[in-house]
Amino acid sequence: MAVISNKNSKSHKRNRRGHIALEVPNIVLDKTTGEYTVAHHVSPKGLYKGRQVVAAPKQK
C-alpha cells in the first residue's frame, strides 16, 4: 500500500487547483472585414491588422 510522505491539507490542495481554470480567448472585431478573430493572430483569410500578410488559401 502506498504511503504519502507529506499530507496536503484541503486548503493547500484547493489553493493549488485554483490556477487550473479555463481562460477565455481574446476575441476582437476586425475593422476591415467585420469578422471576429483571435487577437495577435492571422485571420483565416491571411489578414493581420487589416493588411494582407499571408496569401489566402484558394476556396474550392
From Swiss-Prot:
Q: Name one GO molecular function term.
A: structural constituent of ribosome
Which is a GO BP term held by this UniProt record? translation
Query: Does the record bear Ribosomal protein in its keywords?
Result: yes
Presence of the UniProt keyword Ribosomal protein in the record: yes
Q: Where does it sit, as one GO cellular component term? A: large ribosomal subunit
Q: What domain of life is recorded for the organism?
A: Bacteria
InterPro entries this protein is in? Ribosomal_bL32, Ribosomal_bL32_bact, Ribosomal_zn-bd
Sorted alphabetically, the keyword list is:
Ribonucleoprotein, Ribosomal protein
Q: Which family does it belong to?
A: Belongs to the bacterial ribosomal protein bL32 family.
What is the designated name of this protein? Large ribosomal subunit protein bL32
